[in-house]
Structures are given as C-alpha cells and as structure tokens.
C-alpha cells in the first residue's frame, strides 16, 4: 500500500511531483493507494501546475510503459497540464464499433503495444483525442466522429510541443494520428501509396500498422 511519511498534504506541498510518483509506484509495483493519500492528491491536484513539464512527462512515460490503465485514475491530477485526458474520459461512444469511452478505449489500445515503444505509445495516447471536438449524435442516438483523425493530428502537434517531446517524435506522432484510421488493404497499390506518396520506409510503415492493430484490438467485436 502506498502511504506518505507523516501528513500527506504537507508532503505534497513540499514537492507536488510526489503525487505523480505515488501513481507511478502503483503502476510499476502493482500496489494500491492508501485512501488518505488519494484524498490528499485530489485536494492538492492543482499544485501540479507548478512542477516543470519535463518532470511531469518523465513520470508520465514511466506509467505509460508499465501500466497505462492507471492514467484513468489521474485525470483530475493531470487536468492542469493535460486536460484532454479528462475530456476523453467524459466523451462516450455510443457506436457498434466501441464498448467504452474515448479514454478507456485509448488505454486499452495502449496495452496491446508489444514491445513497448515510446513514440508509438504517445501516438496511441493522442490518437482519438480529436473525437471530443467533432462528436455528433444522430437521430438514432448513435455517435459519429467524422474527421477526428485530422483534428487529433493538429491537437497532437500542440501536445508534442507542450510535453517537449523530441523533434523526431514531433514529426511522426502527428502523422501516425492523422493516418491511424485510414482504410488500409494489403495490396501493392496501397503499399505503394504509403511508401511513395508519404515517403515511408519499412520501419515507419510497420509502426503505422502496429498502431492500427492496437486500435483495432480495442474495438468491439462486430
């Protein structure tokens, strides 16, 4: 069980990053969190805005690699720096293709990423965030998310800058988000389009296919 030494409020006011570390220990070690610690984190969540983004992203990466599902419990804590997660949690998907909200679909998709790759993990984390902005509901109550990949790609550019990711990641993450929902067929014409039109080498084409696989595995069985 994750506990604080002494008063949790005092510990988190000394260094707000400790709130993220508590979740990281839960993710890496499989521990549960003491209720007083969880309550204190919820109370002091706004303090995270005073922590440098580099320190926050370092902890975020550790959680993404070990157990991304923990992020579902961190939306309030991350809200000052990554409000998009909370919006995704609140974005339901009443569709034959989905069984859960945008955030839980995203985290489920990330769990299929084997072996782990940091760039692809961020691409998966960002891939459906555009749905929040484009969601519509038809007369039958079914939800639609037209052009979410394009909107999400633009949003991912901003997130890459906000999180100070590498130049290589800033180049490829928005590309993967933009094309994650493309209609793809395993024929020469389709492969030619990606290899020539988008100048993809084998590595990046396989990366895109891996993202599509993870996304597909986190969909409903039709």
Please place each PLM-identified region on the residue numbering.
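Divalent metal-dependent catalytic cores for phosphoryl transfer on phosphate-bearing substrates
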Residues: 112-221
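Glycine- and charge-enriched loop/helix tracts that form the active or gating conduit
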Residues: 1-117, 121, 125, 129-143, ...
């Amino acid at each position: 069980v994750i506990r604080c030494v002494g008063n949790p409020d005092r510990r988190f006011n000394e260094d707000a990053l400790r709130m993220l570390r508590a979740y990281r220990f839960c993710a890496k070690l499989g521990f549960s969190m003491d209720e007083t610690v969880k309550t204190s984190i919820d109370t002091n969540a706004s303090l995270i805005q005073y922590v440098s983004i580099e320190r926050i992203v370092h902890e975020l990466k550790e959680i993404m690699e070990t157990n991304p599902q923990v992020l579902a419990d961190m939306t309030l804590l991350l809200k000052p720096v990554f409000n998009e997660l909370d919006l995704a949690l609140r974005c339901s998907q009443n569709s034959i293709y989905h069984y859960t909200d945008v955030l839980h679909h995203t985290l489920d998709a990330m769990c299929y990423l084997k072996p782990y790759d940091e760039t692809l993990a961020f691409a998966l984390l960002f891939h459906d965030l555009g749905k929040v902005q484009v969601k519509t509901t038809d007369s039958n109550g079914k939800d639609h998310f037209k052009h979410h990949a394009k909107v999400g790609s633009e949003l991912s550019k901003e997130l890459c800058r906000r999180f100070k990711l590498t130049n290589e990641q800033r180049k490829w993450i928005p590309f993967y988000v933009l094309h994650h929902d493309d209609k793809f067929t395993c024929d020469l014409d389709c492969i030619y389009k990606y290899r020539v039109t988008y100048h993809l080498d084998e590595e990046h084409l396989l990366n895109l296919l891996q993202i599509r696989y993870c996304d597909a595995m986190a969909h409903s069985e039709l």
